[in-house]
């Protein structure tokens, strides 16, 4: 109606409609089918935005979330505090769900989702690693894993065997390899250092030739120390924490020993320094600015370690090369 149109024009809701319109027209294939309005003051505010969006874009709104609904999560230097450390995570999710149940049009959201076209998915080709038992460091100190990487390993026939460098006294029996992912070892460095038997168990396994891939926090744990806290001591380097980001963004990792290059992502406040005559085995380049490069990462024995997070499906052969 004309009165509703005037209300759209005269209210700040028009700016919300402009934002939606901008996303719709920026790309012809945007595929935007509906709008969920966030941080509104109440039902009347939502109605203003809903009418403006409908008037200027023709899109339906599927409900709203009021700004008083507490969906905030605590954060630290690398982003959100992991779910493993949020003791009331489930009750908070349930309370948030209760609060938005009356303001979201769930049937409409599901209907719009059902109309979405099927996205093309490239066939996944995994190297076969049937029967390979891989120890997976997983606790509050080590929780940064791409779910797709774990799925890829299991798709290749790997049995993932979780263990805790914080709580367990030694590695699980009968392992063929180790995967030490990222996380917050610097937050738990005192406890990690105090678990001497686990540190010795890991070092003994690696010195005996067990294949291992250590990524970011996992690499830090294998170093001689994090700040003043003694770590596994397998890699000839020391780590220190800084008060600012050292690296952040997409990178290209060139393995100087094999000549292969892999896309990856770095995000860390830590800095490392090789000890003795040790040298780094990778050349890292900023993906958006290839002229920026720096050394990083090490091979030692059958262990490969570095700050970069890799997605195994970008180079499936990487999995087999790491642990065979």
Positions of predicted regions on the chain:
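Internal gly/pro-rich beta-alpha loop/helix module
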Residues: 13-125
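A glycine-centered loop/beta-turn motif at secondary-structure junctions
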Residues: 295-322
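Inter-motif core of Ras-like GTPase G domains
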Residues: 1-11
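Beta-strand-turn-beta hairpins that frame and shape the catalytic cleft
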Residues: 129-132, 258-262, 299-304
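Pocket-forming structural segment of enzyme catalytic cores
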Residues: 224-292
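Structural motif
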Residues: 36, 179-181, 307
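Cysteine-nucleophile active-site neighborhood
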Residues: 185-255
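Phosphate-binding active sites in nucleotide-utilizing proteins
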Residues: 130-196, 200-207
């Amino acid at each position: 109606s004309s009165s509703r149109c005037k209300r759209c024009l005269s209210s700040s809701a028009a700016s919300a409609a402009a934002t939606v319109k901008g996303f719709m027209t920026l790309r012809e294939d945007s595929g935007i089918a509906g709008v969920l309005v966030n941080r509104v003051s109440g039902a009347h505010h939502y109605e203003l935005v809903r009418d403006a969006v409908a008037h200027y874009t023709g899109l339906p709104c599927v409900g709203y979330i009021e700004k008083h609904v507490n969906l905030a999560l605590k954060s630290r230097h690398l982003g959100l505090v992991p779910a493993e450390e949020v003791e009331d995570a489930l009750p908070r999710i349930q309370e948030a769900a209760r609060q938005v149940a009356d303001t979201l049009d769930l049937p409409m959201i599901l209907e719009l989702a059902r109309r979405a076209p099927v996205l093309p998915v490239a066939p996944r080709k995994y190297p076969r690693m049937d029967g390979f038992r891989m120890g997976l460091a997983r606790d509050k100190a080590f929780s940064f894993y791409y779910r797709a990487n774990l799925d890829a390993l299991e798709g290749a026939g790997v049995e993932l065997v979780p263990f805790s460098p914080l709580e367990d006294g030694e590695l699980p029996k009968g392992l063929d390899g180790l995967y030490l992912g990222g996380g917050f070892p610097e937050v738990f460095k005192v406890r990690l250092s105090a678990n001497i038997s686990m540190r010795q168990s890991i070092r003994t396994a690696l010195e005996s030739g067990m294949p291992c891939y250590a990524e970011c926090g996992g690499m830090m744990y294998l170093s001689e120390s994090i700040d003043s806290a003694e770590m596994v001591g397998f890699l000839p380097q020391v780590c220190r924490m800084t008060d600012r980001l050292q690296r952040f963004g997409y990178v290209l990792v060139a393995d100087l020993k094999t000549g292969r290059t892999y896309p990856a992502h770095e995000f860390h406040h830590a800095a490392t320094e090789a000890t003795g005559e040790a040298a780094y085995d990778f050349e890292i380049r900023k993906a958006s600015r290839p002229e920026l490069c720096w050394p990083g990462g090490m091979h030692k024995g059958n262990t490969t370690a570095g700050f970069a997070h890799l997605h195994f499906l970008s180079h499936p052969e990487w999995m087999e090369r790491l642990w065979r």
